[in-house]
Amino acid sequence: MMGGFKVQGKSLEAAQELLDSARVVAEAGAFMVVLEGIPAMLADEITKRIPIPTMGIGAGAGCDMQVLVAQDMLGMNDWVPKFVKKYADLRTTIIDAYNTYCEESSARTFPAEAYQYNAKIEGIENLK
């Protein structure tokens, strides 16, 4: 349909095209439609005018449900779209965790005994 990292449906003509497309999708038997990166007032109108639920991502609060990309909302990326609220800043925490894991693995301090299966195998020295 449409795409790119820019707001869609900002003119009356573009808004009508999006509404028409949503209607076609609904008439084709879809169980829902995703509205992404469109003005909130347009998402409200589409939600009112089609018979299936709308899921919004950057489309305002008027959609039937909301979705965000987990990596964006958890602060795992350097850049996030305007519509994303970062609920955490895990990027540094994740990088630090991977660095610590790599250091411990290289130094052979991981896995420590607490993180190993330590079954005693009688006669292991007799393996051929």
List each model region and its residues:
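Alpha/beta enzyme core
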Residues: 1-81, 85-88, 92-127
